[in-house]
Amino acid sequence: MSERKGMALFAALLMIGLTTCANMAKGEISAAEFKDMLQSRILEVLDEWRVEDQYAVMFFIYPNEEYEYRGYSNIPEFKMLYKNESEMEHNVNPFFRASGDDEERWNPAFWSYDRQWPVIEFEEPNPMADALIDWYESTGVQDIGGESSDVFDENMRYIGTGPNGLPELLKLVTEITKELQTDGVIEAKFGRKLPVILADFDCTWYMINATAEANPNGEAEAYIQACLRHGDISEDQLVRNN
């Protein structure tokens, strides 16, 4: 896709999201409406970013037990980050150093948290947090933020899918990310193909698989290989794109 077509699509998607926000009935929201809201916010953030020497974008999605919002806890925050090649070998974590290039390049603990853009955060009032909970309630997500205690297999590998509500959100974000890649929006923004990493602090198997699905042309292969090398996911857990 040409840069001009990519940017035109970028603008059209942004307008769809803004229209959805304006027309949405308060307290009730469908998956399609919430997806449009997420997409609109993601495009707004991308539009704000300067093109530098970025090598990857990260969609950081992490359930936070510390915050309570509208009576719920352990619901996911969503922030957008990027990292530049010029930052490699410059430790951005004041508490500990990376054990190697893989960790410094891909572990979110070594990405600059001075450069975070919120998509969903839980500081009241927050329209995106309200929309997330309205969507959960409208679609009947049960025990929002709760999680089963039976989440390890016989080899003590974590096989859970995160707290209730996270799989549903991750599915939408994966769909949006895949569309950004296949429609050429990321390439049009940065002038080159970049991986979009879906991540949490724990490098969970389901986040790694979501990243593989969201980057259908192998954009995130270097990240996937790093996760395999470090045992964050095994080959039998990894779901490859066909």
Residue ranges with predicted function:
Residues A11-E28:
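Bacterial Sec-dependent signal peptides at the C-terminal "C-region" and cleavage site
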Residues R50-P94:
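N-terminal interaction modules that seed assembly of large macromolecular complexes
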Residues M1-F10:
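Bacterial N-terminal signal peptides that target proteins for export
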Residues S86-G162:
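Low-complexity, serine/threonine/proline-enriched polar segments
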Residues L169, E175-N242:
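Glycine-rich, aromatic-bearing surface loops/beta-hairpins
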Residues I29-L43, I159-L180:
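Well-ordered, non-membrane alpha-helical segments in soluble/globular domains
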Residues I29, L38, L81, E85, ...:
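Leucine-rich tandem repeat or coiled-coil scaffolds
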Residues A25-I61:
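Short N-terminal edge-element motif at the start of the domain
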